[in-house]
Amino acid sequence: MACSIVQFCYFQDLQAARDFLFPHLREEILSGALRRDPSKSTDWEDDGWGAWEENEPQEPEEEGNTCKTQKTSWLQDCVLSLSPTNDLMVIAREQKAVFLVPKWKYSDKGKEEMQFAVGWSGSLNVEEGECVTSALCIPLASQKRSSTGRPDWTCIVVGFTSGYVRFYTENGVLLLAQLLNEDPVLQLKCRTYEIPRHPGVTEQNEELSILYPAAIVTIDGFSLFQSLRACRNQVAKAAASGNENIQPPPLAYKKWGLQDIDTIIDHASVGIMTLSPFDQMKTASNIGGFNAAIKNSPPAMSQYITVGSNPFTGFFYALEGSTQPLLSHVALAVASKLTSALFNAASGWLGWKSKHEEEAVQKQKPKVEPATPLAVRFGLPDSRRHGESICLSPCNTLAAVTDDFGRVILLDVARGIAIRMWKGYRDAQIGWIQTVEDLHERVPEKADFSPFGNSQGPSRVAQFLVIYAPRRGILEVWSTQQGPRVGAFNVGKHCRLLYPGYKIMGLNNVTSQSWQPQTYQICLVDPVSGSVKTVNVPFHLALSDKKSERAKDMHLVKKLAALLKTKSPNLDLVETEIKELILDIKYPATKKQALESILASERLPFSCLRNITQTLMDTLKSQELESVDEGLLQFCANKLKLLQLYESVSQLNSLDFHLDTPFSDNDLALLLRLDEKELLKLQALLEKYKQENTRTNVRFSDDKDGVLPVKTFLEYLEYEKDVLNIKKISEEEYVALGSFFFWKCLHGESSTEDMCHTLESAGLSPQLLLSLLLSVWLSKEKDILDKPQSICCLHTMLSLLSKMKVAIDETWDSQSVSPWWQQMRTACIQSENNGAALLSAHVGHSVAAQISNNMTEKKFSQTVLGADSEALTDSWEALSLDTEYWKLLLKQLEDCLILQTLLHSKGNTQTSKVSSLQAEPLPRLSVKKLLEGGKGGIADSVAKWIFKQDFSPEVLKLANEERDAENPDEPKEGVNRSFLEVSEMEMDLGAIPDLLHLAYEQFPCSLELDVLHAHCCWEYVVQWNKDPEEARFFVRSIEHLKQIFNAHVQNGIALMMWNTFLVKRFSAATYLMDKVGKSPKDRLCRRDVGMSDTAMTSFLGSCLDLLQILMEADVSRDEIQVPVLDTEDAWLSVEGPISIVELALEQKHIHYPLVEHHSILCSILYAVMRFSLKTVKPLSLFDSKGKNAFFKDLTSIQLLPSGEMDPNFISVRQQFLLKVVSAAVQAQHSATKVKDPTEEATPTPFGKDQDWPALAVDLAHHLQVSEDVVRRHYVGELYNYGVDHLGEEAILQVHDKEVLASQLLVLTGQRLAHALLHTQTKEGMELLARLPPTLCTWLKAMDPQDLQNTEVPIATTAKLVNKVIELLPEKHGQYGLALHLIEAVEAISLPSL
């Protein structure tokens, strides 16, 4: 409760504002760094060496100090203003200004804090050479009913050396400009509405006062408020339409010419004042002598005080009504940020006609009205003293003045005299803080002397003067008028003290009472630390003197705090001193504060705390009842009860108590009302859960369950009307409190009955105790599962709690739901520790059944014999609504447990690469999460697990086959055989197939195979979208999509994938490849598509698969019925988002030709990327109709190309397809010249490659290119690469074999030409000489360089020649040439035989 300085805001980047306002400082720093030593950045070994030498020159050091001073003291040279609502700060220098706005951001430490960030920066000058001299940030009140009294927006008022006063918005938009005097503006000050504290105080009007060297102008606040609102509305309308032509209302102002004073530096407008009759007669006598006439009523006057020289302080009084207010011509303008259209609109507002006339109007200054003379009435004459600033107190009774002698002088405004002076404050900055008394802090004893009984009267107000001395770097707070210094802080020498002295403009006596914004009267801006601080001064410091009891109390509190921090071995002595100190404190509020600090001490043992509280309680009870504060007495009593409860619980926990009763499985089955089979099933489930759910928890040796310090215990609990409640604490703290009460009881180490009786007697409700008990049980799952005996303890504890009063309502019957059991079920539903939740639900169900049976037994006791009633209790369970809810909960918890066990299981897979997305841990499940997850929540959670484990779809299929198998022996072999098809990485799956099988049995509807594959498909594509570089995710997603059997689901999922994730990237890839005309490089792919070139190749291949799946599903969906999505009986109440499968079934039918059209484009793009083709523009293969149809909704009907295509398009398409075939054959057969006939297509990094020749033929069919041309080219390429055996197979598909034979004849000639002409052996030359001339000439014309494989055996070529003769008709022109070739080939073959 002492004076304090509080940091409430930071600057996000104050250096940026400094560099903008002082560009030379930034240049000096940069040039200085380069000037010192250019080699420092590279030669670190010489950096700083020799700095200790004595003969080092001192000049650079002084220069550095000067630069450092300029760097830190720059704020002193700026014009600074802060809005009183802290929503805007202005820093200006010369022509430039920076507007700073607060934003909530997280600091480096993760704490949310308010930071001032640059909202606007720029130049404010309009005329050449004018500079900013003063600035104000005035918040304007909102006129909306919903926000009455709150600030709507903040206006920035800026005065210039040219005499102009301009008004801006927060975004730097110029609203209004006024030239009321041609001299420079010296100071701007504002006064806003304040509710008068007393009925006799004159109500002050709002105004803006502008000080000039020889005049003062006051603008009426109401007029200014309306004008600014109108100007702001016009700017907003002009920005929207540009057609507004509304003239804002003129400003009403008064202008006084101050006379009989040499210089004026600052001023204060006190407002309207009315003299008392005595003061009226005294003033009249001083002015007019003893014969002066006196009016009947004292006139109202506006008082102004100026500081300067001759006189040092001048007092001016302007009679109200002596002059009429002047009306200004508003010069409306807009900021340079708005467009030229807005300037044209603005010209319409002011009646400007043309650009030439507009410039003329701007250059012509408005008419300046003459000032009304106003002579100084009196002053404080001091010819040598020059005033520097004046600051008026909040209640307008005092004013503080600084001068050039380093003095701060306190003035009595009403009397016009100096009443106090402080010395030694050169360049001081001053402000005021007004504090209102809190009536609750008054001493109750003093109320007895009041003649009005307990009436304490209105709150008092205290004023404190704040002085900042920058020369000494100290901030002081003084109590006025003659009070002592109540606070002093070291704050640095480069700060600025801001005291606005006003609040929100536009309020009145009604709206000012509605909502009070948070305002700081004083703000200290520290540019070094980049922070904004304020000062808090409690009211009681105004009463501080040598006789003040509160000051004495504060001294005792400080002494007590110091005593609590000391480490003393003699605790008895410390306890005695603390008792004396707390009993000496007089004020109840301070005494309560002292007791709170004692109870919060960690160094005092429990006995000390109890004795001190008991002593204070006894002292208060011994006093008279009227003089004792009831709040303090109740506080002590409550704390004493808590201490007694803590002692009782600690004693019960420390007793040596053990339950030695043996506990068997039969006992557990009877306790939980389960038969042997059900118990074995429960134990098996929990054992699997324990194995898969073991989590390593870090524990320290000092951590002990069930131990709670007394300090923490007191912080958690509170009494309210004799009822013990728990404060709002975190979950961990809640568990710690519950462990303190129940942990030893759950382990059988403390008496359960005694603990329940103690807690009930202390005032804890059964509902609260049940909540604590369950929080402990559910959070300590690992310990509970390791110790089954704790189940018996929980059963006992729950039975005792249920028997307490108000636990179970006496009016409860079997047809209604008991809130008691509903509370327990809700805790189990919300728990993520499913093992502990399932056990507690079994215990709760057993206790509830026992109580229900007892109630039923009482009802039917008259008709049932005693022997039968025992049988009734043991073997029969009374039917009730609660029983049904328990059974439902047990089924849900069992399902959730099995699912949680599955999700925490891990296969021993050794994947080569694990993505960071797969490394993210899965969230734990609870029944509540599954109920709120929608119908697809269960499948979605399993899909996330499958993604994390990266299992292939075959694993899901195998587990499902195991479920469908009829013979339990055969599936094992079938599963083992099928596992050979799964990759080696997934061989060792451990218990995962069994767990999956169990989950399938538990969720036959939610985990139906199509539903699971759909969710897995969606999960993989979602994760791929997060990191498109992981192309294997997209490939795996397509694999799951292919596994979906139902065509309706498959169609919907594929269509959703395309629309949500693929079409944008697909279109980007298309336009990029069409732009570059080839396979784009990695950098371009990353920039435009967001993935690498390798990933984009796989992406296009997967897109092609997806489009083909879409077409296949569309064909087969008419033959398959729409699936019915069922839900398990236990999960019928599930709510939440619609499932992926339901969304898929809602999708429209696709337009098959449009999908086929996209598939053709995708094939082209994939081929270009797969084989790095060049000089290919994909879109150039389509006409305008084809291009326009791309990337449209696949369910819409588009105008597609039809009829005969332009031959030019067909020619280009044919060239492209032949190029694809050539590239495909080259990619397949260039590495090894001879291939195994049984070898399949070469695999790509992301799966098997396409059958490109077949795909090219299919594309030829859709692109109106002759398919036979493509097939013939494929055959020719195969023979070209020497793969004759594959070529013979491909010949069978060619229709025009005659043309093919001619092409193959040329290829045969190339092979023979290479063998005879290019090898140039002796035998070859002799053979060439024996050949017919026609054949020899033809062979010489062949170019063997076109051959891709020249090492084909001659026997293979002989087969090719025979094949050509077989294909050529005898009448063909080249048939004879082919016969000659046979002879040549046979002749070449002879030497090798």
Swiss-Prot record:
Q: Where is the signal peptide?
A: none
Swapping G1052C leads to an effect described as: In MARTS1; may cause exon skipping
Superkingdom of this protein's organism: Eukaryota
Which InterPro entries does this one have?
Answer: Rab3GAP2 (IPR026059), RAB3GAP2_C (IPR029257), RAB3GAP_N (IPR032839)
Record-listed Phosphoserine modification sites: S39, S450, S916, S978
Region (Disordered) location: 36-67
**Compartment list:** Cytoplasm; Endoplasmic reticulum
Pfam families in alphabetical order: RAB3GAP2_C, RAB3GAP2_N
Question: Found in which tissues?
Answer: Ubiquitous.
User: What Gene Ontology cellular-component terms does the record carry?
Assistant: autophagosome; cytosol; endoplasmic reticulum membrane; plasma membrane; presynaptic membrane; protein-containing complex
Q: Which residues carry this modification: Phosphothreonine?
A: T901
Q: Acidic residues compositional bias: what residue ranges? A: 44-64
Q: GO BP, one example?
A: positive regulation of protein lipidation
State the UniProt keywords alphabetically: Cataract, Cytoplasm, Disease variant, Endoplasmic reticulum, GTPase activation, Intellectual disability, Phosphoprotein
Disulfide linkage:
none
The UniProt entry lists the main location of this chain as: cytoplasm
Endoplasmic reticulum in keyword set:
yes
Named from the GO MF annotations, one term is: GTPase activator activity
Spans through the membrane: none
Which disease is the protein involved in?
Martsolf syndrome 1: An autosomal recessive disease characterized by congenital cataracts, intellectual disability, and hypogonadism.
Give the protein family: Belongs to the Rab3-GAP regulatory subunit family.
- Report the protein's function: Regulatory subunit of the Rab3 GTPase-activating (Rab3GAP) complex composed of RAB3GAP1 and RAB3GAP2, which has GTPase-activating protein (GAP) activity towards various Rab3 subfamily members (RAB3A, RAB3B, RAB3C and RAB3D), RAB5A and RAB43, and guanine nucleotide exchange factor (GEF) activity towards RAB18. As part of the Rab3GAP complex, acts as a GAP for Rab3 proteins by converting active RAB3-GTP to the inactive form RAB3-GDP. Rab3 proteins are involved in regulated exocytosis of neurotransmitters and hormones.
Q: Report quaternary structure and partners.
A: The Rab3 GTPase-activating complex is a heterodimer composed of RAB3GAP1 and RAB3GAP2. The Rab3 GTPase-activating complex interacts with DMXL2. Interacts with LMAN1.
User: What's the protein name?
Assistant: Rab3 GTPase-activating protein non-catalytic subunit
Q: What species is given as this protein's source?
A: Homo sapiens
